[in-house]
Structures are given as C-alpha cells and as structure tokens.
Amino acid sequence: MLMPKRVKYRKPFSAPRIKGVAKRGATVSFGEYGLKALEPKWVTARQIEAARIVISRYAKKKGKMWTRVFPDKAITKHPAETRMGKGKGAPDHWVAVVKPGHILFEVEGLDLDTTKRAMRMASDKLPIKTKLVSRR
C-alpha cells in the first residue's frame, strides 16, 4: 500500500471540501496516454493500488506506466463501539486529494485499443469519473 515514509503531522486537518481545478499535474508529461480525473474526490491508497495492478496487467512487459497521484493525507478514525469525544482518532488510512483535471495514471508503449481497455478497467476501480487523454 502507498503511504508516506514520514510526515510532519500525524493527524492533519480534514478540509471540508475540495475547491477548484488542478493547477499542477494536469497535462500528460511522461507517457502517450493518461487517465484524467473529472470530479473532485479523495482517492484511497487501496483504490490507487487496485487501478495500478489492472493497468500493469494490461501493460505486461511491452508498456510503461506512471502513477501520478500519491496518498499523502492521513484519515483518522475512532475504534468501533467507542463513545463520542476523547480527542481525535488514530490514523486509519491514507488518501490522495484529487481535483478535476488531474492526471492519475500515464502509459506508454501500448496500442490505443489496449490502452482504452486498461484505462476503462482502472477507472472502474476508482470512485471518480475519468476520461482517457492523449499527449497530442
């Protein structure tokens, strides 16, 4: 699972909503095709990993893949059957804050049909609407 090696603060503030569009990471920089987010959402490390596995299965050894998102925000949670109060819960899982327009994954060295199938399968693993974009 993806997670930071170390963080400055263990329990960050959770922002009430994700505003605006992606300013950085909004263009296909490394590969030929990319999977672009169309809506704002938190994407968990498990979801990123599931999508990465699907794309790598399609790419096999002939293609190359880049993951352009990283879960660097800790989400805290109280244990089950715990009364309210008593401070903030312990870190439970990690999420990446994704804004509309952000490129999530990039691939290179695959034909268009294989890329479309791989990205569609990866998109099914993610909680957001996405679209396939090309460098050209």
UniProtKB/Swiss-Prot annotation:
SUPFAM superfamilies the record matches: Ribosomal protein L16p/L10e (SSF54686)
The entry's keywords: Ribonucleoprotein, Ribosomal protein, RNA-binding, rRNA-binding, tRNA-binding
Gene Ontology CC annotation, any one: cytosolic large ribosomal subunit
Gene3D superfamilies, A to Z: Ribosomal protein L10e/L16
Entry's Gene Ontology molecular function annotations: rRNA binding; structural constituent of ribosome; tRNA binding
CDD domains attached to this UniProt entry: Ribosomal_L16_L10e (cd01433)
Gene Ontology BP annotations: translation
Domain of life per record: Bacteria
Subunit structure: Part of the 50S ribosomal subunit.
Task performed by this protein: Binds 23S rRNA and is also seen to make contacts with the A and possibly P site tRNAs.
Family note: Belongs to the universal ribosomal protein uL16 family.
Protein known as: Large ribosomal subunit protein uL16
Source species: Elusimicrobium minutum (strain Pei191)
Protein encoded by which gene: rplP
